[in-house]
Regions:
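Secreted/periplasmic carbohydrate-active enzymes, especially glycoside hydrolases
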Residues: 1-343, 347-351, 396, 411-412, ...
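Substrate-binding/catalytic cleft of secreted carbohydrate-active enzymes
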Residues: 204-206, 318-320, 328-595, 604-605
């Protein structure tokens, strides 16, 4: 099996053609396209950009809210000189499930809207001519998929998504599509693990290939080779190694080659950063030194393109995070585009990488009812659908770790977001996931999950599995909001005192906290939704954080305003952003800039 999640790179032995651009597109509400031959000829199609969500490109609501099957179509040319190579199609992501056809022949199926997949089409393509590529996608939700939800049928027969999560169910081909020509024998995967020494660093590596020929591994600093080894497993010894650090990223070039005699059979290049990350004595240690996490929960979300990868937006986001003094973000609530991790590697940002396990609580009304315990949420992990959900969860977790394990920016894995975790089935569901994450990751990064408001120190059955505790807390917003901030602060302290008793030396971070603020809304004295109230809430919350030595990080919710399903609790989306959806600062951004640019990186370091 030649499955590989390596990022596509052109080398002396590999060829790439990007297939992004304007494709053809058509809805298939009756799911008749396969039988009707749409894989060869897509009828009544319109133009559609790739990558992008299709939703916000339309001006009619039925198209924007469409739920069901939909098709994409394009064509690609295969050069004659590619004959004798393996021809592979690679999709960065299709939300949420996809069937891929080439020249009318089905070549791949995939479920999961946030991770890549590929299809080998060597025996199907026609050389030196154009080939038809068709993708049948579907964006319906269910309780066996990640993220979780349901799909309802309206009175007029149309389907509509009913998510258990609080972000819009954007759909489409969201990330780049590549056509690749790869050698028959090739590098499929590699992994690294780092040790710091008195004279530099050692890099233990493992390389996976699909053939018998020998492997060499070299490390370059610019044009200078600084280490080399041979074999599919080995160690690179780097003298006077330059370490990767927060806002001081240093990257080396890794070159992996397969040799047959004097010929190079395959060559794969990547960039890596030498660093260690661990938890010791209740602190996060980067290269042995304490680091206090400050930053954001985010979303891949922007005007018009929805969740589609947009590199100018990515660049702007990193510039804003540098301006405000952040050093970390969580990929809430799904793995992001690979290009975002590459930029984090280059800019020196830390990432808590989250699998799309969100919506694991059922509510008869909406996410808020479930979060407050008012929904029909008990026993989410005791359903008939749970075994299938767990199987899909393990598959997504495996792909996320396989894809992202070599990024120096990735420091931890988040295995679930706000699951209902007070019922009897919690431990049986959690245990194999945490064991799988530890087994798959050669660097043994810390594992966590985010704890929702109704899961308390004495009721949460999942927290014992976490290497550090991640709390989502909204004292002063969803709980005791408004004029009673003093009561909110007292209740917050009461819960924190409870967590102090169960941490057993583990650090605790906040992965969500915040209030909605409609940009430009001011009120004196303050009221909820105003900029003044948002700042008062943040000052109170930060005072609570600073009171507890075991609090080792603060990731505010959210980096920017983002789109959600419409409803009476959302004013055209979630407005908890510190920046607007257009990436302009709200008043609270200046509060964070003042705090985060003055906090030392080792804030709350333990005195020896």
């Amino acid at each position: 099996m030649n499955r590989s999640l390596l990022y596509p790179r052109a080398t002396t032995t590999r060829r790439l053609i990007g297939l992004d651009g304007m494709w053809r597109f058509s809805f298939d509400p009756e799911s008749k396209g396969v039988e009707a031959g749409w894989a060869l000829d897509l009828p009544s199609s319109i133009s559609m950009p790739v990558p992008a969500s299709f939703c916000d490109l339309f001006t009619d609501k039925a198209s924007r809210e469409y739920c069901g099957d939909f098709w994409y179509e394009t064509s690609f040319f295969v050069p004659a000189e590619w004959s004798g190579w393996d021809i592979v199609l690679r999709f960065g992501s299709v939300t949420h499930r996809a069937r891929v056809f080439v020249n009318g022949v089905e070549v791949a199926q995939h479920e999961g809207g946030f991770l890549p997949f590929d299809a080998t089409v060597t025996n199907i393509v026609r050389y030196n001519q154009f080939n038809k590529l068709s993708v049948l996608a579907n964006n319906e939700l269910s309780e066996t998929m990640l993220p979780a939800g349901t799909t309802r049928t309206l009175a007029d027969g149309r389907k509509i998504a009913a998510p258990y999560f609080d972000f819009y169910n954007y759909a489409g081909i969201h990330r780049p599509v590549w056509l690749m020509a790869l050698p028959k024998e090739r590098v499929l995967d590699y992994s690294t693990r780092y040790r710091l020494t008195e004279t530099g660093a050692e890099i233990d590596y493992t390389v996976s290939t699909n053939g018998p020929h020998p492997v060499t591994v070299e490390l370059y600093d610019g044009t200078t080779r600084v280490a080399e080894s041979s074999g599919t497993t080995g160690t690179l010894v780097v003298k006077n190694a330059k370490l990767w650090n927060v806002h001081a990223a240093y990257l080396y070039d890794l070159v992996i080659r397969i040799h047959e005699g004097s010929a190079v059979v395959d060559e794969y290049l990547d960039r890596i950063g030498i660093r260690t990350f661990e938890i010791r004595h209740g602190r996060f240690l980067l290269n042995g030194s304490p680091v206090y996490l400050r930053g954001f929960g985010r979303h891949e979300d922007a005007d018009i393109r929805g969740r589609g990868l947009d590199l100018p937006t990515v660049k702007r986001d990193f510039e804003l995070m540098k301006w405000i003094g952040a050093n970390c973000f969580r990929t809430s609530h799904y793995p992001y585009a690979e290009e975002i991790y590459q930029m984090a590697d280059e800019e020196g940002f830390l990432i808590i990488d989250e699998v799309p396990a969100v919506g694991f609580m059922q509510s008869t009304a909406n996410f808020l009812a479930a979060n407050q315990g008012n929904g029909r949420q008990q026993g989410f992990f005791e359903k008939e659908t749970t075994p299938t959900l767990l199987k899909n969860h393990k598959a997504a977790l495996t792909d996320m770790i396989d894809r992202d394990k070599n990024h120096p920016s990735v420091i931890a894995w988040s295995l679930l977001d706000e699951p209902q975790c007070t019922s009897a089935g919690t431990e049986e569901y959690f245990k194999p996931l945490f064991e799988l994450a530890r087994r798959l990751d050669p660097q043994k990064r810390p594992r966590t999950y985010t704890v929702l408001m109704t899961s308390l120190p004495d009721t949460s059955k999942g927290q014992r599995f976490a290497d550090f505790v991640s709390l989502n807390r909204y004292y002063g917003w969803y709980v005791l909001g408004g004029a009673g901030l003093a009561d909110a602060e007292a209740a917050f302290h009461h819960e924190m005192d409870g967590w102090a008793k169960v941490l057993h030396g583990r650090p605790l971070i906040f992965t969500e906290y915040g209030t909605d603020n409609l940009s430009g809304a001011h009120k004196l004295p303050s009221v909820m939704w105003s900029a003044e109230y948002q700042n008062e809430y943040l000052e109170m919350t930060h005072a609570v954080f600073d009171h507890y030595d075991f609090v080792q990080g603060e990731l505010v919710w959210n980096f920017a305003d983002f789109q959600t399903t419409e409803g009476i609790l959302r004013v055209d989306g979630n407005k908890k952003g510190i920046f607007t959806r257009q990436r302009q600062p709200k008043d609270a951004a200046y509060l964070f800039r003042k705090r985060w640019t003055t906090l030392p990186i080792d804030f709350k370091k333990r005195k020896k």
